[in-house]
Amino acid sequence: GPKEPEVTVPEGDASAGRDIFDSQCSACHAIEGDSTAAPVLGGVIGRKAGQEKFAYSKGMKGSGITWNEKHLFVFLKNPSKHVPGTKMAFAGLPADKDRADLIAYLKSV
């Protein structure tokens, strides 16, 4: 698979992360259920990219990523740079704290 990103992920606050999820992510992503707009994100930590019932891009399917804190931290800063060709039409979360909080929330669900 791809190399592990060389980043240190700060401690995040899951409740702040939930607010970020609700405002930035929930228009497309759900935590559970059968959303078809975007992959369902409950249990995403430890999951191989491109697994859920979703028509993933070739870039995502072929990325070889197993989602962990470091990959999410880098991906969420600039999705199309980390996984070229991704269908995720989101510019990214520039603030390290926002990404750390969102990851803390995703770890909790």
From Swiss-Prot:
CC annotations in GO: mitochondrial intermembrane space
Taxonomy of the source species: Eukaryota, Sar, Alveolata, Ciliophora, Intramacronucleata
Organism expressing this protein natively: Tetrahymena pyriformis
Xref: InterPro entries: Cyt_c-like_dom, Cyt_c-like_dom_sf, Cyt_c_1A/1B
Alphabetized UniProt keyword annotations: Electron transport, Heme, Iron, Metal-binding, Mitochondrion, Respiratory chain, Transport
Single Gene Ontology MF annotation: heme binding
Binding site for heme c: C25, C28, H29, M88
Highest rank taxon of the organism: Eukaryota
Major subcellular location class: mitochondrion
Protein name stated in the entry: Cytochrome c
